[in-house]
Amino acid sequence: MALKIYNTETRQKETFTPIQPNKVGLYVCGVTVYDYCHVGHARVMVVFDTVVRHLRSLGYDVTYVRNITDIDDKIIQRALENKESIQSLTSRFIDAMHEDEKALNVLRPDMEPKATEYMDEIETMISTLIEKDFAYPAENGDVYFHVKADDDYGRLSGKNIEELDSGSRVEINSVKKDPLDFVLWKASKENEPAWQSPWGDGRPGWHIECSAMSTKCLGNHFDIHGGGLDLSFPHHENEIAQSECATGEHYVNSWMHCGFVRIDDEKMSKSLGNFFTIREVLKQYHPEVIRYFLLASHYRSPVNYSEENLDVAKASVGRLYSALELVPADQAEPAESKLEAEFMAAMNDDFNTPQAMAVLFELAKEVNKQKSPGLAALLKKLANQIGLLEQTAESFFKSQPSDSDLTDEMIEALIVERAEARKAKDFSRSDEIRDELLAQGIELLDSAEGTSWRKI
């Protein structure tokens, strides 16, 4: 089955055909680095990491670009509040972002352009838009894109100019020609960073940054552009307008958007203050559990964040690892099975990870039934393609976050003491040790080979 991707612009699934045979250019809007990443950011990271993994499994040579917004009103404000330099603030949170995504087994993008490193490209694009009468300098030193000069504006969101006009606020004494116009260049203010330009010192607007970076890294016309659903309008709509008016070429073939992570029916966001950072959640749940939770819903659907749903994810990942616990996955080549074709068909159907995971559970059931190392190897291989089952079962079960103060050595010592108690027929002490460990979230598993343990 050929790969099909739901294109936000056409509102339908389309068979994916790359612009250049066997090559894919993918650009994703990344994080504005003024705070720690939250679970909403994690979803975008994990979803597009999974998209890239699948494209590569199909044999495509993928160039994955995910930008970093390192200059922005929020960044400036946070740096002032913290009494630290913008460079210090953004460097700190870029490092934190990389730590978080590494924990979630998210592979680093091939390119990670920062807005502040692309000022020449931004200036060139703005100059081109002014020359072509799609943009104009205002009397206050700002530069604006003139929305009504672009006859095609609104095609991604399905909004037409009349609708936008009726919903726009009348601005008194505005320097804009029209309330719909958006900023490309902001004139500098006191105590704000600024770059020189033909229109005076200032800094770029958010939308133009992505147009300049994406076209510089991938060319004027590339295959896939992704991001969160909240970016489809106005950010991505404005990107299309700027890019196509500047270059005269079609900008992007396929637009992909992730649904929101929600808490109590509200989008998780820093501005609403209802967010959980990735590192907060990592204190409670194993990274693979968080990754599984984010992939258990189709990427276009909303995800409801709750401990109950994360607990379900924890149990589900545990079931998959349990299938590998007694059947070695590293001692055989992956077996042939129709389930592999079913897994690939699910992923080729607009990256349907819930259906692909259902196939993994079917495969786990067969591993448990047949005790086949070949099927275990296949389970691990397919799960790895979506970034799961990367550890050994023993390592997974022993590395769950826990409130217990017991070290591995202390647990092993208690297991030895329990074995001696059982040998001496002191079953009271044996049960006491088992219960003691269970109370600390440690489960003992007795078998013919001896006693093993796991965190629960």
Swiss-Prot record:
Q: Which keywords fit this entry according to its UniProt record?
A: Aminoacyl-tRNA synthetase, ATP-binding, Cytoplasm, Ligase, Metal-binding, Nucleotide-binding, Protein biosynthesis, Zinc
Q: Name one Pfam family in it.
A: CysS_C
Q: Which InterPro entries match?
A: Cys-tRNA-ligase (IPR015803), Cys-tRNA-synt_Ia_DALR (IPR015273), Cys-tRNA/MSH_ligase (IPR024909), CysS_C (IPR056411), Rossmann-like_a/b/a_fold (IPR014729), tRNA-synt_1_cat_dom (IPR032678), tRNAsynth_Ia_anticodon-bd (IPR009080)
Residues annotated as binding Zn(2+) are: 29, 210, 235, 239
Its EC number(s):
6.1.1.16
Q: Gene3D superfamilies attached here? A: Cysteine-tRNA ligase, C-terminal anti-codon recognition domain, HUPs
Q: Where is motif 'HIGH' region found?
A: 31-41
Where is it located?
Cytoplasm
Reaction(s) catalysed (UniProt annotation):
tRNA(Cys) + L-cysteine + ATP = L-cysteinyl-tRNA(Cys) + AMP + diphosphate
The answer to whether UniProt assigns keyword Flavoprotein to this entry is no
Question: Which top EC class applies here?
Answer: ligase
Q: Domain of life, per the record?
A: Bacteria
The record's comment on protein family reads: Belongs to the class-I aminoacyl-tRNA synthetase family.
Which HAMAP family did the record assign? Cys_tRNA_synth
Q: Which PANTHER family would you find in this protein's record?
A: CYSTEINE--TRNA LIGASE, CYTOPLASMIC, CYSTEINYL-TRNA SYNTHETASE
What's the protein here called? Cysteine--tRNA ligase
Specify the species: Hydrogenovibrio crunogenus (strain DSM 25203 / XCL-2)
Encoding gene per record: cysS
